[in-house]
Amino acid sequence: MAVLSLAQMLEAGVHFGHQARRWNPRMAPYIFTVRNGVHIIDLVQTAQLVEEAYNYIRNAAEKGKRFLFIGTKRQAAGIVEQEALRCGSYYVNQRWLGGMLTNWTTIKTRVDRLKELESMEESGLIDLRPKQEASALRRELARLQKYLGGIKQMRRLPDIAIIVDVKREYNAVAECHKLGIPIVALLDTNCDPTQVDIPIPANDDAIRSIKLIVGKLADAIYEGRHGQLEEPEADLADEDDNGMTTSDDGDAEALDIPDDSDA
């Protein structure tokens, strides 16, 4: 039985690509036709690649591999967080901080600071500080939670990255390449499929499309770890509308955690 049916993908708008003038020619093998100036993705190939990705991820999860979901665009951010937590994985759904993987040792010091501040907040120690200092500490805590909360329990680099929109997340892709981390990615007709290990051609701007595919990849992780699909608990503690428009590509941020005013 197929992981995803054509009917499911059609209903979610997975087949809608970008305007033909915005395409990446390397996506040509995955394009079915052009309608009203918009590329239509070949869903037969999408279904095959979703199944390939599902089996690959499930098998990796069975072996104890760890996964990092990456998706910072508005349409993907909430889904990435929800599905990563559902299957006990890590996630980045805000700005990608330069060096988040390649400079992990430094990033880890900020993660440790996040844990320290959370402990201080929970124990009431922040309340004992002068008002101005307490306010500054809480602002710092909020910033760290926003940008690093999804990797708070990540003690080592992930084994596999699952990315929504490799064109937008180009810095994350580059860091994965440098470190030899395999990439499974949902990518639209304006992306380069040669940049990833398993490309899943799909509408990466429609919420329902993203939810459908990212949800299936999260299912694969959960099934690999637990042997069946049930509603899981977050499992991190032990580990050191069908829009067709795209959001603008976001620039990568420096290693410093940005202030909220810069977000």
Curated annotation (Swiss-Prot):
Keywords for this protein = Ribonucleoprotein, Ribosomal protein
- Segments for region (Disordered): 228-263
Q: Which InterPro entries would you find in this protein's record? A: Ribosomal_uS2, Ribosomal_uS2_bac/mit/plastid, Ribosomal_uS2_CS, Ribosomal_uS2_flav_dom_sf
Q: Which GO terms describe its cellular component?
A: cytosolic small ribosomal subunit
A GO biological process of this protein is:
translation
Compositionally biased spans, kind Acidic residues: 230-263
Q: Does the keyword Ribosomal protein apply?
A: yes
Q: Which CDD domains match?
A: RPS2 (cd01425)
For this protein, the record's Gene3D superfamilies field holds: Glucose-6-phosphate isomerase like protein, domain 1 (3.40.50.10490), Helix hairpin bin (1.10.287.610)
Q: What is the annotated signal peptide range for this record?
A: none
A GO MF annotation of the entry reads: structural constituent of ribosome
Q: Name one Pfam family in it.
A: Ribosomal_S2
Keyword NAD (UniProt): no
Protein family according to the UniProt entry: Belongs to the universal ribosomal protein uS2 family.
Q: HAMAP family, alphabetically?
A: Ribosomal_uS2_B
Which PANTHER family does its entry note? 30S RIBOSOMAL PROTEIN S2 PROKARYOTIC AND ORGANELLAR (PTHR12534), SMALL RIBOSOMAL SUBUNIT PROTEIN US2M (PTHR12534:SF0)
* Full protein name: Small ribosomal subunit protein uS2
Q: Which gene encodes it?
A: rpsB
